[in-house]
A protein has these predicted regions:
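Cross-family detector of peptidyl-prolyl cis-trans isomerase
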Residues: 6-217
């Protein structure tokens, strides 16, 4: 069956090929993400890909001095761990609420599409309710506490992008109790198949910088 999109009648296969090329170009461009006023938001740089085997051999870490990202072949998600975070990993059989703040950069659009690390969203961060089910993570955006954050209000869905769940096997999700501590921070390249609902529908990849911190009980 041939799948067609309304995007100039490109086939789905053509859209996926365009996405793949955009990701490759993004990784090779030594890019700096800037806001609408031209101010630097984060320096991405030229990305070095490592395998899952190398990632494991390095103790499930990525060398930020080399700008390493691990590629997970089963999903196409690339991940860099900037900070492991405080506390502990989410244990099997446990559920937690996690505060998330992020920058979302549309790689095909070459611009910031959404960000919650700005003043307007500080009182209403995205809250992820996440469960570890025998090493498999499921999650949704919890709207009961604050009515939902930037992701819910922008895309109208409580579904957490599958790509966002990848880091939880490797990071800690405690709270920052002193200035010397740092909460978990990761960077991701997420293809449409693992992305938010709009990316999935329109076949575009996103770059994310995200922080995660466990809510107080």
């Amino acid at each position: 069956m041939l799948l067609l999109s309304c995007n100039n009648q490109e086939t789905y296969a053509e859209q996926k090929e365009k996405e793949s090329k955009a990701i490759s170009s993004f990784m090779d461009r030594d890019i700096t993400v800037r806001d609408a006023d031209g101010f630097e938001v984060c320096k991405v740089g030229k990305i070095v890909t490592i395998s899952e085997e190398q990632f494991q051999n390095q103790g499930y870490t990525t060398d930020t001095t080399k700008n390493e990202y691990v590629l997970f072949n089963n999903t196409g998600v690339y991940m860099q761990i900037r900070r492991m975070g405080t506390g502990e990993k989410l244990e099997q059989g446990k559920t937690a609420r996690v505060i998330c703040r992020f920058i979302e950069f549309n790689i095909l659009g070459d611009s910031i599409q959404l960000r919650s690390d700005v003043n307007v969203w500080h009182p209403k961060p995205d809250i992820i309710k996440i469960s570890n089910n025998s090493g498999s993570f499921t999650a949704n955006f919890d709207t009961e506490i604050n009515g939902g954050g930037a992701m819910y209000h922008s895309y109208g869905s409580t579904s957490v992008p599958s790509g966002w769940l990848v880091p939880f096997s490797y990071i800690n999700i405690g709270r920052q109790d002193s200035p010397e501590e740092g909460i978990a921070k990761v960077r991701l390249i997420v293809p449409h198949s693992e992305g938010q609902v709009n990316a999935t529908s329109n076949v575009y990849p996103c770059f994310y910088e995200l922080t995660f911190q466990k809510m107080r009980d």
